Regions:
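Beta1/beta-strand and adjacent pyrophosphate-binding region of the FAD-binding site
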Residues: 2-15
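Flavin (FAD/FMN) cofactor-binding and adjacent substrate-gating region
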Residues: 92-171, 177-183
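Central beta-strand plus flanking loop segment that forms part of the substrate or channel wall
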Residues: 50, 219-236
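Glycine-rich FAD pyrophosphate-binding loop
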Residues: 24-45
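Flavin (primarily FAD) binding-site architecture
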Residues: 202-217
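Core beta-strand elements of the Rossmann-like FAD/NAD(P) dinucleotide-binding domain
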Residues: 3-5, 190-199
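Dinucleotide-binding Rossmann-like beta1-alpha1 core, especially the glycine-rich loop
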Residues: 48-130
Length: 236
């Protein structure tokens, strides 16, 4: 236990692995531990989409969308082998939103993030592409693109890159306890080993509250609120 790491990360999901990659790439000494395998839980159960958040434009959250689109482009650039543009179709009916508003929103979505290698949005002939499926009022639509990615592979690649920069990646190593002793974090693993670190990061995903209270023994007035999304998948 002689070595003191700059950073110890609990959790090997995309957040933990991403932090490890970034920190190790900046020259910090990093150790990451996960109770299972890297990317083996929530980060492999996602929608597998990297998107800019088109719907946030209606709430005038332009800064958020711009940042998300820039990050989408970065991910697509560095992980092109495991990602691809995927089209989305918005059926148009004049009683829902005016066409000019949708066009404006998609124009902003195409350009807010700066130069992009992802296809631009365009109008779409619904009747020609999907005859006898949609109601008569849905004749025209709009097509835009986001990125679909292998989420688990992305997480593993982040961890591998961190490891190449001398980060220590510990799979199947559950953190039993973490406590501050003489201004340093002492992390006890379930296998009996102890690790020292200057900084501790709790990136345990949906187990973050449990880890905070049971393993780190810190009482917090605020709790992380979990969010779940659902997608309906049908045959073509």
């Amino acid at each position: 236990m002689s070595k003191i790491f700059d950073l110890f990360i609990i959790g090997g999901g995309i957040n933990g692995a991403g932090i490890a990659r970034d920190a190790a790439g900046r020259g910090l000494s990093v150790c990451l531990a996960d109770k299972g395998e890297i990317g083996g839980a929530t980060s492999s159960w996602s929608t597998k989409l990297i998107h800019g958040g088109l719907r946030y434009l209606e709430n005038y959250e332009f800064k958020l969308v711009r940042e998300s689109l820039k990050e989408r482009e970065i991910v697509y650039k560095i992980a092109k082998s495991i990602s691809k543009p995927i089209p989305f179709i918005i059926p148009y009916a004049d009683k829902i939103r005016p066409a000019w508003l949708i066009r404006l929103g998609l124009f902003l979505y195409d350009n807010l993030g700066g130069k992009s290698n992802i296809p631009k949005s365009k109008t779409f002939d619904l009747k020609k592409k999907f005859p006898n499926i949609l109601k008569e009022k849905y004749k025209t639509g709009f097509q835009y693109f986001d990125i679909q990615i292998d989420d688990k592979k992305l997480t593993k690649l982040n961890a591998q890159d961190a490891k190449r920069n001398k980060a220590k990646i510990l799979e199947h190593n559950k953190v039993k306890k973490a406590e501050i002793i003489e201004n340093e974090w002492v992390i006890s693993l379930e296998n009996g080993k102890k690790i020292k670190s200057k900084v501790l990061i709790n990136a345990s995903g949906p187990w973050i509250n449990e880890t905070l209270h049971k393993n780190i023994k810190i009482k917090s007035k605020k709790k992380i609120r979990l969010v779940k999304g659902s997608h309906i998948i049908t045959k073509k």
